[in-house]
Amino acid sequence: MAFQQGEAAPVSTQSSLSFTQGFLLGQLSVVLLIGAFIKFFIFGEAPPPPSRGLRASTHRRSNSIFSQDAPPPRSLREKPSTSNVLRPVPSSATNTRSILRKTYYSAIPPNPSSKHRIHHSSHQPESLDWFNVLIAQTIAQYRQTAYLLKDSPTSSILHSLTAALNNPEKKPSFIDKITVTDISLGEEFPIFSNCRIIAVDDPMSDGGRLQALLDVDMSDDNLSIAVETSLVLNYPKPCSAILPVALSISVVRFSGTLCISLVPASTPPLHTPSPMPSPPTAGAQPAAGAQPTDGGDIPPKSSSKSNIAFSFLPDYRLDLSVRSLIGSRSRLQDVPKVAQLVEARVHAWFEERVVEPRVQVVGLPDLWPRMGRTGVRTGDESETGSNTASRPAMSVDMSSPGHLQGDGGNHEEELRFRGLGPRPPLPFDAVSRTSSYQVETGAPRSPSLTRERSLGDDFHMPGSMPEAPGAQ
């Protein structure tokens, strides 16, 4: 018995020491973990955020050549002068080499300093499948609009063509009135492909000018026009003889290379030789730096706008099918000489307008978001009502005279076309709109869209005391 009691004493002492050591070691580890957390997670410096552009793109931008000579950043306390608020644009902002380098497009020739620059691009050509879809939708919309306006006395394509063909300033006196008998706008669409960007020499811009080349092909389409007229013999007396003529012109195939380039607003308009120069005025000659006063030389708008210039290369292909019928009783059908004359005239008309070196310059539309051009998709009435309820302060009075006359006299027609102006009652159910707003369908919207019930009428805080019946 004594021997067993002697063995139990060392075992209890050893277990108490092991418990104390484990307890102290656990407390020390907890203190170290808390200290490391405070040091590295609370007082540690945050790592710089990674650049999303460098992670998403395989290319890495090199430092700009202007980074070494760039001025030091200004302090926020330094107030800029009121006459120069906009920061200056670098001189190389429109340089072709800078634009292509920043967009990762390899279009600069190997030896750009040579006199004759090589017009080619080492970049892979684009297929333009998405562009073909957009162009097809646009052409289809134009065809549908032309058909819907066929009965309009002034806006139809028939009226426009008749007025253009019977222009007294261009039509010869031996041709009687031209009547359009058939018009076909076609059913197919042009196919664009093999788009490439090249750099061409331009003395008006620094480093040349960028130009897009697109191969276009349109074939097997029913694009035609048929007219009837008469050849009048006015000698020895007026209308001494009349020869009826009927023509039908169809486009069999058209293919070529379309050139598109942007003309900045500061660049003067491209010099396009005119086949009919305007006669000089009888007054004194203007000064060297004076502006011309002729209304045909000055654009109607004084605001400078960027323009887009497009043309076709001279190696285009335009195949026409001309059918003719001459005479009243004994008729001559499909005379080869008549077909040659008509084809030569059509080719001359086309080359005088859109074949290099002549280009067509069109002003780019204003893409700045304006409330007058804001529309709502017809299939999102319910979603639009909920979004408008959350933004009642952004409502605009569309029926006020000042708003309709802000951008021009025909602004009301544009709003009606876009579905924003006064319009007749719509066939869809408008209960969802009238239940939230006091707006009558078919009438102009009120200056403020007043809700029938305020949002605070049915709002209750969870756990709040009920209000007294007489409380306001």
Curated annotation (Swiss-Prot):
PROSITE patterns: SMP (PS51847). Residues 124-365 form the SMP-LTD domain. GO terms for cellular component: endoplasmic reticulum; endoplasmic reticulum membrane; ERMES complex. It is found in: Endoplasmic reticulum membrane. Residues 81-92 have a biased composition (Polar residues). Residues 44-472 are cytoplasmic. Signal peptide: none annotated. Residues 270-280 have a biased composition (Pro residues). GO terms for biological process: aminophospholipid transport; intermembrane lipid transfer; mitochondrial genome maintenance; mitochondrion-endoplasmic reticulum membrane tethering; protein insertion into mitochondrial outer membrane. Residues 51-92, 270-303, 370-472 are annotated as: Disordered. InterPro entries: Mmm1, MMM1_dom, SMP_LBD. Keywords: Endoplasmic reticulum, Lipid transport, Lipid-binding, Membrane, Transmembrane, Transmembrane helix, Transport. Residues 450-460 have a biased composition (Basic and acidic residues). The chain crosses the membrane at residues 23-43. Component of the ERMES/MDM complex, which serves as a molecular tether to connect the endoplasmic reticulum (ER) and mitochondria. Components of this complex are involved in the control of mitochondrial shape and protein biogenesis, and function in nonvesicular lipid trafficking between the ER and mitochondria. The mdm12-mmm1 subcomplex functions in the major beta-barrel assembly pathway that is responsible for biogenesis of all outer membrane beta-barrel proteins, and acts in a late step after the SAM complex. The SMP-LTD domain is a barrel-like domain that can bind various types of glycerophospholipids in its interior and mediate their transfer between two adjacent bilayers. This is Maintenance of mitochondrial morphology protein 1. It comes from Emericella nidulans (strain FGSC A4 / ATCC 38163 / CBS 112.46 / NRRL 194 / M139) (Aspergillus nidulans).
